[in-house]
UniProtKB/Swiss-Prot annotation:
The keyword Membrane does not apply. InterPro entries: Aldolase_TIM, DapA-like, NanA, Schiff_base-form_aldolases_AS, Schiff_base-form_aldolases_CS. The gene is nanA. Aceneuramate binds at residues 47-48, 166, 188, 190-191, 207. It catalyses: aceneuramate = aldehydo-N-acetyl-D-mannosamine + pyruvate. This is N-acetylneuraminate lyase. The keyword Chaperone does not apply. Homotetramer.
Length: 292
């Protein structure tokens, strides 16, 4: 297994206007991340990949393309989580057979699952695949909150390496790192990277890293070195960019920023707005000129 720490892009997926996967565009996004952004790895099949609007076959195809293009150049994490446990297991087996370095799974959502059911979900995926696992915690979208003691219960399974922590609860983050120092934490909010790194995270997984990895790496390294004023200056610029992206449409705008760099990033998947308006294109061009 490769080193899983550092800067990981949450991989965007290029779609054609009819919603089908644009394989050429997806390969270009992967190459851009590896060759230009110099990421340490890719997190494939997450929220940024518009994953929860895709069929099982489409998810498998994205895993296949990403592994075929990246090969062993960087670390690859496959997000296989689903409210359908059978699908999660099927995807986990497939990604493991392809040679992904680790699996990740979002907490099961929509229904109010008990913690015992959530633990069973993770233990089952691990038992069926034999691969390592990263818990994907994103409570503002799933409504699932896992406490410090509950993480301890999950961590009794030695295959669970840590958590992708996409939350703003830095008290919980600090408590987790203190309680379980041997388990890894990846920051999931790009706009709050500096405080997360100051609290000891081992890496970061972010959507804006598809276009902004150099600054993300600066924040990560400067904060680790204790150069907080310098790191904060970079975080300010990063957040100015992120603010513009969020106001203009997150995934759509990042795709337009990639297109401005010659990457065939395609469209978004409906029911998201698939194609940028003229106004959104103007904003993307202004963001590109100012920040990239």
């Amino acid at each position: 297994m490769k080193n899983l720490t550092g800067i990981f892009s949450a991989l965007l997926v290029a779609f054609n206007e009819d919603g089908s996967i644009n394989e050429q565009g997806l390969r270009q996004i992967i190459r851009h991340n590896i060759d230009k952004m110099k990421v340490d790895g890719l997190y494939v099949g997450g929220s940024t990949g518009e994953n929860f609007m895709l069929s099982t076959a489409e998810k498998k195809e994205i895993f296949r393309i990403a592994k075929d293009e990246a090969k062993d150049q960087i670390a690859l994490i496959a997000q296989v989580g689903s409210v359908n446990l059978q699908e999660a297991v099927e995807l986990g087996k497939y990604a493991t057979e392809l040679g992904y370095d680790c699996l990740s799974a979002v907490t099961p959502f929509y229904y109010k699952f008990s913690f015992a059911e959530i633990k069973h979900y993770y233990d089952t995926i691990i038992a069926e695949t034999g691969n390592n696992m990263i818990v994907y915690s994103i409570p503002f979208l799933t409504g699932v909150n896992i406490g410090v003691e509950q993480f301890g219960e999950l961590y009794k399974n030695p295959k669970i390496l840590g958590v992708k922590f996409t939350a703003g609860d830095f008290y919980l983050l600090e408590r987790l790192k203190k309680a379980y120092p041997n388990h890894l934490i990846w920051a999931g909010f790009d706009e709050m990277m500096l405080p997360a790194v100051a609290l000891g995270v081992d890496g970061a997984i972010g959507s804006t890293f598809n276009v902004n990895t150099p600054r993300a790496r600066q924040i990560f390294e400067l904060t680790k070195q204790g150069k907080l004023a310098e790191a904060l200056a970079v975080q300010h610029v990063t957040n100015d960019l992120i603010e513009g992206i969020l106001a203009n449409g997150l995934y759509l705008t990042i795709k337009e920023l990639l297109k401005l760099q010659g990457v065939e990033a395609g469209y978004c998947r409906e029911p998201m707005t698939a194609k940028a308006t003229d106004k959104q294109l103007e904003v993307a061009k202004a963001l590109y000129a100012k920040f990239l």
